[in-house]
From Swiss-Prot:
UniProt name for this protein: A disintegrin and metalloproteinase with thrombospondin motifs 15
Native source species: Homo sapiens (Human)
Any one Gene Ontology cellular component term annotated for this protein: extracellular space
Subcellular localization(s) per the UniProt record: Secreted, Extracellular space, Extracellular matrix; Cell surface
EC number, as in UniProt: 3.4.24.-
Annotated disease: Arthrogryposis, distal, 12: A form of distal arthrogryposis, a disease characterized by congenital joint contractures that mainly involve two or more distal parts of the limbs, in the absence of a primary neurological or muscle disease. DA12 is an autosomal recessive form characterized by congenital contractures, primarily affecting the small joints of the fingers and toes. Additional features include knee, Achilles tendon, and toe contractures, spinal stiffness, scoliosis, and orthodontic abnormalities.
Tissue expression from the record: Expressed in fetal liver and kidney, but not in any of the adult tissues examined.
Positions of the propeptide segment: 18-212
Disulfide bridge map: C293-C345, C322-C327, C339-C422, C377-C406, C448-C470, C459-C480, C465-C499, C493-C504, C528-C565, C532-C570, C543-C555
Chief localization: secreted
Length: 950
């Protein structure tokens, strides 16, 4: 009756997307030369030393030959296990023998096969062969003491296959949302098909990938933590079980389909014997992840050079984890957090040996990989099959290509962008540590108990090696249930056969060796990214000569090279607009779907406040506002990184180039602004201003063509706020900086017809305005003096081109040496202006009256008279065109509210609140009482927030 119920419900419980799994009892045969083909039950790692081993497993009408060697790659030299909390009965510390348990290899000499097994306590682990996965584990009495063992060494082999067609749309088993973020968009941008539009006359986009273009081995130093529920469930076998999972995950990351040499290295295992020893674990996956991340951060070492420092941490628990909408969640991690000590972590719900795939999946998220079904992936690569590692359902894995093209592209971009630099430090020395197939260690019954709890048994009539169906109870009746994973690799599926990659395979072709990858020849250079003005061409090579196989190393070294092309200036460059300006202008009229901007918005490049890492993004500001956005993840190749730099952007990375536009060139502008010049084609102009009047004072007029401009205003007695501020006007008299009695306290970049001037802001003891390249428009420098009228000290210098045929005899040398004139008089090092005779009458201005406003926009007046040489008033005698102004704007800036960032939300779900602090800040950064700021315009200090529904 019980059997009938199982049969009925096994068919009723079948889900779309795959047939029932298969299983078979097998007896592994060791075929080493010293064994001579007899049936042999593995006693332990001491039997072989460091020699290779060969096992034959016959199952599912096939022979599987596992050619195994010790594998040391997934355990660090300083690997250790630590127990925290009160010891549990029956649990002992890890044995050093575990270091020699794990082996890896291949199956039947298939290029895409793999084997990862443990040889301690029986043959247990997993292997993959011809698209199927196999899990092998000893039957219960097979791991008994030697005197009680089954003389035949019986093992259970399970297999599951790769789906041949659509698999339906099962619920996602991952707690990470299948959305996209700007980093994913940036990573996939090079793959996107280009449409006709902006830049075709001046640029042509290329297809391809890579930024830093170098394939470098990465070592992911990993902390593995098991909570109290894991300790109670697995007992003394826990450490071996965890390492079996990590061994399989490490093998997946060494597969060449990921296109990068990545090594998962375990540096420490922590076993938590009681709840108080570790982080708080609940059914809320997001909260558990947050608790674990904070907990592991406190335990980690400060220095990355410490042998027990970890780059990422993984928590395993038997707690049923729930995501935002379902409790089918098997894991959760924050996306793109590798090398972030506070957030590089993941949480895994243990459901048996398939947790190895969940581990690899969640680590993929930490490496910034999204799910394969995100819209951006599908737009670039088409609809991807649901049998890759980053499928949200994670039901079937294509062992021939476990990583999709989208995942490989994104992790490559992530590493090339510098986000994985903490992974470059290599463990101090290699240790020969084994790697095994999980099916060699765990029977089919044990796999069911690991997945569904004590007492769960394999369902009868399963198809070998495909989905693992196990018994359970629902509403008092016996049912068959599955988590859509196959039998563990290495599970026996017939005489001379075992499960591998979900299929039952035979053993043959034993002498299969590891193949390291090697670079193929360089492809030809692609098209130039621009038709003029300096573009870039790329050439790449692939790791296909040969492709890595059987756990071999991925290629190391430069994978993409580049060169400059089409360096002749563009005809439209006379307009003075830079190529970056044109790229921003292409978005004019696009209001970014926000009501802050109108459809008439005009976009200009943003330079100030942009971090060096973001210089090759197209960051544009809405002209006349403070709003700015990333309008494109990368500028067109060949765009200057900044107006005062000769470096250019290549695939989103700033690459050094010469002033001639050639990548790798060492040519530089001299102080005259001449590319490759010798500093002899210009003359230096210097000056000093020290005696101002209240308001704006003329300092110097800088002609067009001036270069190496350096203007400095040193604060009175070293003070930061001495009430003297540099100001700048263009040739039309429009203020470009600190006009109308409004000054900038922060650093700013001013772009004037393509030339960049860097302003230090007023918050420094030495206020400066500098430009290295020649300016294309005459500018006027002034100094604004207010307040206590402390004397300014403005020094300026710049270089002007020499006259082509300058007659030095017409300018006799001043016996006093180079002239340095003061107070608003332009001076040349080889020329002195003679003062004009004083006219008989001149304008005389009185002192300024009080300001009409205490702060903000006020006015003040003064008397202006025309007086003769004797001081009498002679109104008609003065030139009206030179009459001084009688009225001017005045008033210091009013105190303003200074805001801090919002605090985190007080609740992880549901309605919470967040705060921020307010300060009333006066002119010069002085902290004032709140009532001195406009209370009617006081920003909000407290607000409600909802991170997600509970």
């Amino acid at each position: 009756m019980l059997l009938l119920g199982i049969l009925t419900l096994a068919f009723a419980g079948r889900t779309a997307g795959g047939s029932e799994p298969e299983r078979e009892v097998v007896v592994p045969i060791r075929l080493d030369p010293d064994i001579n083909g007899r049936r042999y039950y593995w006693r332990g790692p001491e039997d072989s030393g460091d020699q290779g081993l060969i096992f034959q497993i016959t199952a599912f009408q096939e022979d599987f030959y596992l050619h195994l060697t010790p594998d040391a790659q997934f355990l660090a030299p300083a690997f250790s296990t630590e127990h925290l909390g009160v010891p549990l009965q029956g649990l002992t510390g890890g044995s050093s023998d575990l270091r020699r348990c794990f082996y890896s290899g291949d199956v039947n000499a298939e290029p895409d096969s793999f084997a990862a097994v443990s040889l301690c306590g029986g043959l247990r682990g997993a292997f993959g062969y011809r698209g199927a996965e196999y899990v092998i584990s000893p039957l219960p009495n097979a791991s008994a003491p030697a005197a009680q063992r089954n003389s035949q060494g019986a093992h259970l082999l399970q297999r599951r296959g790769v789906p041949g067609g659509p698999s339906g749309d099962p619920t996602s088993r991952c707690g990470v949302a299948s959305g996209w973020n700007p980093a994913i968009l940036r990573a996939l941008d090079p793959y996107k098909p280009r449409r006709a539009g902006f830049g075709e006359s001046r640029s042509r986009r290329r297809s391809g990938r890579a930024k830093r273009f170098v394939s470098i081995p990465r070592y992911v130093e990993t902390l593995v933590v098991a909570d109290e529920s894991m300790v109670k469930f697995h007992g003394a076998d826990l450490e071996h079980y965890l390492l079996t999972l990590l061994a399989t995950a490490a093998r997946l990351y060494r597969h060449p389909s990921i296109l990068n040499p990545i090594n998962i290295v375990v540096v420490k295992v922590l076993l938590l014997r009681d709840r108080d020893s570790g982080p708080k674990v609940t059914g809320n996956a997001a909260l558990t992840l947050r608790n674990f991340c904070a907990w592991q951060k406190k335990l980690n070492k400060v220095s990355d050079k410490h042998p027990e420092y970890w780059d990422t941490a993984i928590l395993f628990t038997r707690q049923d984890l729930c995501g935002a909408t379902t409790c089918d969640t098997l894991g959760m991690a924050d996306v793109g957090t590798m090398c972030d000590p506070k957030r590089s972590c993941s949480v895994i719900e243990d459901d048996g040996l398939p947790s190895a795939f969940t581990t690899a999946h969640e680590l993929g998220h930490v490496f910034n990989m999204p799910h394969d079904n995100v819209k951006v992936c599908e737009e670039v690569f088409g609809k991807l099959r649901a049998n890759h590692m980053m499928s949200p359902t994670l039901i079937q894995i294509d062992r021939a290509n476990p990583w999709s093209a989208c995942s490989a592209a994104i992790i490559t971009d992530f590493l090339d962008s510098g986000h994985g630099d903490c992974l470059l430090d290599q463990p101090s020395k290699p240790i020969s540590l084994p790697e095994d197939l999980p099916g060699a260690s765990y029977t089919l019954s044990q796999q069911c108990e690991l997945a569904f709890g004590v007492g769960s048994k394999p369902c009868p009539y399963m198809q070998y090696c495909t989905k693992l169906w196990c018994t359970g109870k629902a509403k008092g009746q016996m049912v068959c249930q599955t988590r859509h994973f196959p039998w563990a690799d290495g599970t026996s599926c017939g005489e001379g056969k075992l499960c591998l990659k979900g299929a039952c395979v035979e053993r043959h072709n034993l002498n299969k060796h590891r193949v390291d990858g090697s670079w193929a020849k360089w492809d030809p250079y692609g098209p130039c990214s621009r038709t003029c003005g300096g573009g870039v061409q790329l050439a790449r090579r692939q790791c296909t000569n040969p492709t890595p196989a059987n756990g071999g190393k991925y290629c190391e070294g430069v994978r993409v090279k580049y060169r400059s092309c089409n360096l002749e200036p563009c005809p439209s460059s006379a307009s003075g607009k830079s190529f970056r300006e044109e790229q921003c202008e292409a978005f004019n009229g696009y209001n970014h779907s926000t009501n802050r901007l109108t459809l008439a918005v005009a976009w200009v490049p943003k330079y100030s406040g942009v971090s060096p890492r973001d210089k090759c993004k197209l960051i544009c500001r809405a002209n006349g506002t403070g709003y700015f956005y990333v309008l494109a993840p990368k500028v067109v190749d060949g765009t200057l990184c900044s107006p005062d730099s000769t470096s250019v952007c290549v695939q989103g990375k700033c690459i050094k180039a010469g002033c001639d536009g050639n990548l790798g060139s060492k040519k530089r502008f001299d102080k005259c602004g001449v590319c490759g010049g010798d500093n002899k084609s210009c003359k230096k102009v210097t000056g000093l201003f020290t005696k101002p009047m209240h308001g704006y004072n003329f300092v110097v007029a800088i002609p067009a063509g001036a270069s190496s401009i350096d203007i400095r205003q040193r604060g009175y007695k070293g003070l930061i706020g001495d009430d003297n501020y540099l100001a700048l006007k263009n040739s039309q008299g429009k203020y470009l900086l600190n006009g109308h009695f409004v000054v900038s306290a922060v650093e700013r970049d001013l772009v004037v017809k393509g030339s960049l001037l860097r302003y230090s802001g007023t918050g420094t003891a030495v206020e400066s305005l500098q430009a290295s390249r020649p300016i294309l428009e005459p500018l006027t420098v002034e100094v604004l003096s207010v307040g206590k009228m402390t004397p300014p000290r403005v020094r300026y210098s710049f270089y002007l081109p020499k006259e082509p045929r300058e007659d030095k005899s017409s300018h006799p040398k001043d016996p006093r040496g180079p002239s340095v004139l003061h107070n608003s008089v332009l001076s040349l090092s080889n020329q002195v202006e003679q003062p004009d005779d004083r006219p008989p009458a001149r304008w005389v201005a009185g002192s300024w009256g009080p300001c009409s406003a205490s702060c903000g926009s006020g006015l003040q007046k003064r008397a202006v008279d025309c007086r003769g040489s004797a001081g009498q008033r002679t109104v008609p005698a003065c030139d009206a065109a030179h009459r001084p102004v009688e009225t001017q704007a005045c008033g210091e800036p009013c105190p303003t509210w200074e805001l801090s960032a919002w605090s985190p939300c007080s609740k992880s779900c549901g309605r919470g609140f967040q705060r921020r602090s307010l300060k009333c800040v006066g002119h010069g950064g002085r902290l004032l009482a709140r009532d001195q700021c406009n209370l009617h315009r006081k920003p909000q200090e407290l607000d409600f927030c909802v991170l997600r529904p509970c």
